[in-house]
């Protein structure tokens, strides 16, 4: 049986994934750590918007900020998140196989 802690953890993940930009950040960080400006450019959002999304993801415990001199880069908070995102994508594509084709994804 799920505990309140399990429920809260899944709710935090659901909140993080409920926004396309935050989902994009998680998928990008699954590949490699990145600076906020690079994430903003890659996802087509302002740096201020990216800052807000990263703050949300930090608050959810999904990403970590790593100081690097005068700059800060971000990474997934735990390597298990990378595997979880991979599995979640597999499930989505299994349940809705027609959402992605050679021209992109609609899901």
Model-derived features with residue positions:
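Amphipathic alpha-helical dimerization/coiled-coil segments
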Residues: 1-9, 79-107
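N-terminal helix-turn-helix DNA-binding core of bacterial DNA-binding proteins
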Residues: 2, 8-46, 71-81
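Residue-level detector of secondary-structure transition/capping positions
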Residues: 33-34, 58, 89
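Functionally engaged cysteine thiol sites
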Residues: 37, 41, 56, 60, ...
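Residues within the DNA-recognition helix of helix-turn-helix
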Residues: 53
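Beta-hairpin "wing" of winged helix-turn-helix
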Residues: 58-68, 75
